[in-house]
Amino acid sequence: MGRFMNLCSVYINRLDTYRRMVNKKISAGQMEELLKMVRSREVLDTGLKELYDNFDTAFLHLFPDFVDKFNDLLQPEERIVLRKGELLNTELRIFALIRLGINDSSQIAEFLRYSVNTIYNYRAKVKNKACVSRDDFENLVRKIHSVSYTHLRAHETR
């Protein structure tokens, strides 16, 4: 929770800094430079990468075994292998959101900045790789335990 509160504070500060810079450029009549900045995707792309990196880190902190447990639901030859430095890829991120209770494809699409159709396609593609029933797949993803739940269950059995 603290991580996301800090992240919100950082984003508010960045927004305020950006607002002040825009105001300064308007006051100085630097419209061309301002237009160039507004048309650039660099700030957006950097912010999105940071958001997804923070999401991936926080999610895997709560569900450290998620990738392994998710792969257990897939046929061995269809398991997801992450690239070096990658915490989650798009497929895993979609199902991480589902694990968190965000099931609506339009909400997932909005967060990941894809079309709803693309999210449907990813979901269908992954379900087709499953070694379990397609109908049960998402319910089984929702049952992947968090570290705190697993930790609590271990203490209950003692």
Residue ranges and their predicted role:
Residues 150-157:
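Conserved small/polar residues in nucleotide/adenosyl-binding loops
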Residues 1-86, 90:
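Membrane-proximal linker segments that couple transmembrane helices to downstream signaling/catalytic modules
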Residues 49, 53-149:
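Cytosolic nucleotide-binding catalytic cores of signal-transduction proteins
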